[in-house]
């Protein structure tokens, strides 16, 4: 097992997660590599089908069959300094890590919370699973967590059921459950997608404050670059199961080194950019085409059929993830020209 840098909490190297059947193999994640530093937020961005959620499920050991890690290394440093290769960890090993060292929140809290149990019981169950404390202390800790996630009148909401809360409140409960045992790593899989813009901003602000308070690292999965600008330190852009660009957040927004990243940003509404010279509203830009099936990727660059910079070499030569400037990587034959 290789050594981790002192400030690195998660290091993924050449991760391949494939879904195999008798007829075909779907390479949902194909050679993904990135590092997440302690106390920072790494955003993984891409359209539906890019492989970002499968990457997160591979890390936390929640893949469904026939999905399986084919190869690669996922090194995680726990709160005691011990390094685990999550790609080789058994489900028994994951049960010790999930909740205590690594936690996850999902896109739709209503389907993640049990409708038959109160929110206090569900937060308390997470605490009782990992800590040897009595029921009274467990309930006290659950109440403290509701306070941390800023649920008003927490003492009276502790015995509420999920259906008695709004979508934003339920997501706060999910965050309280995830952070109940003070994990080192929080994986957030599109936690604001199902919320309206106002509540979305409140949840992002809450995550930033809790990160400063608890000192956790966050792996943030999203398709929304506006959210990335609010919360991330580093950005990984995925397309068709591969990383196509990686950079610190500010340089990425200032200048993109891959056409797909450029296209994603161009799709984001902008009040000034979306006006023509006469002041009329222009049609919102969209990237032409769609993500190719991962079972039938083109032989060259996977983005070539949709790319306005494509040349003949792009149809036959698979680009490699290479340096594109200081602390930047891009998978494009023409990244130096973009």
Residue ranges of model-derived segments:
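P-loop NTP-binding/switch modules centered on Walker-like glycine-rich loops
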Residues: 47, 61, 187-191, 195-278
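Conserved ABC ATPase "signature" region
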Residues: 137-156, 265-266
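Short catalytic/signature loops enriched in Gly
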Residues: 2-8, 83, 155-156, 246-338
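Conserved ABC ATPase signature
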Residues: 160-165, 169
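A short, proline-enriched helix->beta-strand linker immediately N-terminal to the Walker B motif
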Residues: 180-184
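ABC ATPase NBD coupling module
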Residues: 80-103, 129, 251-256, 292-298
């Amino acid at each position: 097992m290789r050594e981790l840098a002192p400030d690195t909490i998660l290091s993924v190297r050449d991760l391949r997660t494939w879904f195999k059947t008798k007829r075909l193999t779907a390479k949902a994640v194909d050679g993904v590599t990135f590092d997440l530093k302690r106390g920072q937020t790494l955003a993984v961005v891409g359209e539906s089908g890019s492989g970002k959620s499968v990457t997160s499920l591979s890390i936390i050991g929640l893949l469904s069959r026939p999905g399986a890690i084919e190869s690669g290394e996922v090194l995680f440093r726990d709160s005691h300094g011990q390094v685990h290769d999550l790609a080789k960890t058994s489900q028994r090993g994951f049960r010790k890590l999930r909740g205590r060292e690594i936690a996850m929140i999902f896109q739709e809290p209503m389907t993640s919370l049990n409708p038959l149990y109160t929110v206090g019981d569900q937060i308390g169950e997470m605490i009782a699973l990992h800590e040897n404390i009595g029921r009274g202390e467990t309930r006290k800790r659950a109440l403290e967590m509701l306070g941390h996630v800023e649920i008003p009148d927490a003492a009276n909401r502790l015995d509420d059921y999920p259906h008695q809360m709004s979508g934003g409140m339920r997501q706060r409960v999910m965050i309280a459950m995830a952070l109940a045992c003070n994990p080192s790593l929080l994986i957030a899989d599109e936690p604001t997608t199902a919320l309206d813009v106002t509540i979305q901003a409140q949840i992002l602000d809450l995550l930033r404050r809790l990160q400063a308070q608890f000192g956790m690292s966050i792996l943030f999965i999203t398709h929304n670059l506006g959210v990335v600008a609010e919360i991330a330190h580093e950005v990984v852009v995925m397309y068709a199961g591969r990383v196509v660009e990686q950079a610190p957040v500010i340089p990425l927004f200032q200048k993109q080194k891959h056409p797909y990243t450029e296209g994603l940003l161009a799709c984001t509404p902008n009040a000034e950019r979306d006006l023509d010279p006469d002041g009329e509203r222009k049609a919102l830009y969209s990237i032409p085409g769609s993500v190719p099936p991962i079972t039938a990727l083109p032989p060259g660059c996977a983005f070539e059929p949709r790319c306005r910079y494509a040349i003949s070499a792009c149809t036959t030569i698979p680009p490699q993830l290479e340096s594109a400037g200081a602390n930047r990587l891009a998978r494009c034959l023409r990244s130096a020209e973009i």
